[in-house]
Regions:
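Sec-dependent signal peptide recognition
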Residues: 1-8
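Rhodanese-like catalytic fold shared by cysteine-dependent sulfurtransferases
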Residues: 2, 18-19, 25-57, 66-102
């Protein structure tokens, strides 16, 4: 876990970017999501924008970490080498130092 925080600090200090993806349902998304997150339900994850480079850091989250784990594996298998499961929405919020908004 400590390494993840160091990696995020490095990204912020160097201006490198990362993408946050909420893989929950639309109803769950509407109850609150991380600021700046994209919404793509886990089973549709390969509809990810071609504007996102395959080497970009991508953090995925859901309610518990289960669906985001599945989506992470799909992205890794598709060549997105830096896809990471950030766990639940609250875990992702802490990990990425990003607030939950309505």
């Amino acid at each position: 876990m400590y390494f993840r925080y160091l990696a995020l600090l490095l990204f912020s200090l160097t201006g490198m970017s990362f993408t946050i993806i909420d893989v929950r349902t639309e109803a769950e998304w509407n109850t609150g999501h991380l600021e700046g997150a994209l919404h793509i339900e886990w089973q549709d994850i390969l509809e990810i924008s071609s504007d996102i480079p395959k080497d970009e850091e991508i953090y995925l989250y859901c309610r518990s970490g289960n669906r985001s784990g599945k989506a992470t594996k799909i992205l890794l298998d598709a060549g997105y080498i830096n896809a990471k499961n950030a766990g639940s929405i609250s875990e992702a919020s802490k990990l990425l130092n990003t607030k939950i908004i309505d």
